[in-house]
């Protein structure tokens, strides 16, 4: 019953947010390039998983529908105890294919919380709970321990080709060697920033560089990259793969990028990088996020990795819970393999493939700035 009440409360919250998300589609058959230009950065999964067709920058991200399951029917006005499954052998699971829901444990960043991360929670096997769907959006998928979680690997993916997004349709960021959708580790650009920023340290030909943070509005388009030495005490330079170097190269300088005719020339010893010319998406206003529109912990990463089993993100022992706004106080109970999510308070929002993800909860920054 506890799980049902949380799901129902989530449905009410999503009704309030209907104006923001009701017209948003994660992926679709009819519109190509939708992810790159018109989609907001925070996207909830649509209620009809079969509409998710173009979910990929790689075969691992393709949508592969599994065998449909029969959902228990509920008569309006009745309680969970009176629900009658249409099939005694049906399993209350949600078909979300490889565009799956991923849940991140809701706890403060390491070393900043007075309470440790809460242990994983499971549902009692004696109380099967039906998944509740808030049309037109999937709110949650509550499963019993007997409901197996299908983690699709590349071997399980069908032969359907993944949608390749053109470089100029991608989200802003730093991309590796012209591979669509592959993003180097580092922070996002602020909306008013120009396309280059300092990359300290030695740059290897295949080592992703940790960018030092969002650049300020006064950053010039090209800045010097400090790298290895070319001769004596003269600093040498190397170039990130896929970033366009221009101008004359000094001895021992190297590049694996491809110059682009449209890129303006710069002085010797500098580098320029190309950022797709699209507008940075902005956080929906009901979330109460200010500044440049991103959570404090939003960062690019090449992969998310395994994010763990089914847990409840609404923890009563969280040090920030009493200070968070009610509109974000609901939990999503779901089991899945990695799909980028943004953690806003106690809420988890799915992001389209290759967009932004939040690996650590911005709970601390929320409380420090607003409370």
From Swiss-Prot:
GO annotation (BP), single: sporulation resulting in formation of a cellular spore
Cell compartment(s), UniProt: Spore polar tube
UniProt keyword annotations, A-Z: Glycoprotein, Signal, Sporulation
Principal cellular location given in the protein's record: other
Signal peptide interval: 1-22
Residue stretches of biased makeup (Low complexity): 65-94, 255-270
GO cellular component annotations of the record: polar tube
Region described as Disordered: spans on this chain: 65-95, 229-270
PTM per Swiss-Prot/TrEMBL: Glycosylated.
The protein's role, per its UniProt record: Involved with PTP2 and PTP3 in formation of a polar tube through which the infectious agent is passed on to the host cell.
Misc: The host antibody response is directed against the post-translational carbohydrate modification.
The protein's name in its UniProt record: Polar tube protein 1
């Amino acid at each position: 019953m506890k799980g049902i009440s949380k799901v129902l409360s989530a449905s009410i919250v999503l009704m309030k947010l209907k104006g923001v998300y009701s017209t948003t589609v994660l992926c679709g058959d009819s519109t190509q390039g939708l992810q790159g230009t018109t989609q907001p950065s925070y996207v909830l999964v649509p209620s009809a998983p079969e509409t998710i067709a173009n979910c990929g920058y790689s075969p691992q991200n393709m949508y592969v529908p599994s065998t449909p399951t029969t959902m228990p029917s509920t008569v309006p006005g009745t309680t969970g105890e009176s629900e009658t499954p249409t099939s005694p052998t049906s399993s209350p699971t949600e078909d979300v294919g490889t565009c799956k829901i991923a849940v991140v444990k809701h706890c403060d960043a390491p070393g900043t919380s007075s309470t440790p991360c809460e242990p994983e929670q499971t549902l009692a096997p004696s109380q099967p709970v039906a998944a509740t769907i808030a049309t037109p959006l999937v709110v949650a998928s509550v499963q019993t321990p007997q409901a197996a979680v299908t983690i699709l690997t590349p071997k399980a993916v069908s032969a359907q080709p993944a949608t390749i997004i053109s470089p100029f349709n991608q989200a802003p960021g730093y991309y590796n060697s012209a591979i669509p959708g592959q993003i180097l580790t580092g922070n996002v650009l602020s909306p008013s920033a120009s396309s280059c920023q300092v990359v300290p340290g030695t740059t290897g030909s295949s080592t992703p560089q940790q960018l030092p943070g969002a650049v300020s509005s006064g950053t010039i388009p090209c800045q010097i990259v400090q790298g290895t030495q070319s001769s004596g005490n003269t600093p040498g330079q190397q170039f990130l793969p896929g970033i366009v170097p221009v101008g004359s190269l000094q001895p021992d300088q190297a590049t694996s990028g491809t110059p682009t005719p449209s890129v303006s020339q710069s002085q010797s010893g500098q580098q320029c990088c190309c950022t797709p010319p699209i507008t940075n998406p902005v956080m929906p206003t009901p979330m109460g996020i200010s500044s440049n529109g991103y959570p404090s912990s939003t960062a690019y990463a090449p992969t998310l990795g395994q994010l763990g089993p089914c847990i409840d993100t609404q923890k009563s022992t969280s040090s920030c819970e009493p200070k968070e706004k009610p509109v974000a106080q609901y939990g999503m109970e779901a089991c899945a393999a990695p799909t980028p999510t943004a953690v806003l308070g106690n809420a988890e929002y799915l992001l389209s493939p290759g967009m932004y993800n939040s690996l650590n909860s911005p709970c601390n920054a929320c409380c420090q700035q607003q409370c």
